Amino acid sequence: MAHHPEVQHAIAEMVMEMEAIAPQLDTVAEDWSNGVDHGHAWVIKLVGAKYRAVEGAWKVVDAALDVTGGSGIFKKSPIERLWRDARLGKIHPGNYALSHEFVAKVALGIDPDEPPRWG
């Protein structure tokens, strides 16, 4: 299987996706550990890092399931657990809508905690 061009393409996509996640997480973690004051921009940095990591993990695990086929859905497969974890990360607070709402409000100078949240 490793010599099949489609499998190689899928593996390359997975590797590049994972490589893109780490630098953002490392930067946010380092800034947090060093007490860097990003003010309200912390919302963008923290929510953005979580969102990108979860979306990237989902893409990688979904592609891995495509490559492995049906055997990846069984409990004995480590891909099954990774698939479940990655999928649940997408709905764990904050989900897609909430993440986008908070990031956009902060970027637009709107206090995300100020009522009303919508309207």
Model-identified regions with their sequence ranges:
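Glycine-rich beta->alpha junctions and the first turn(s) of the following alpha-helix
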Residues: 1-18
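A ubiquitous short alpha-helical element
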Residues: 12-16, 44-49, 118-119
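Alpha-helical transition-metal enzyme core signature, strongest for iron centers
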Residues: 14-25, 50-60, 86, 90-93
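C-terminal helix-coil-helix/basic helical segment that borders enzyme active sites and/or dimer interfaces
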Residues: 19-51, 65-73
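Short segments within alpha-helical structural elements
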Residues: 60-66, 97-101
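Glycine-rich phosphate/cofactor-binding loops in nucleotide/flavin-utilizing enzymes
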Residues: 71-119
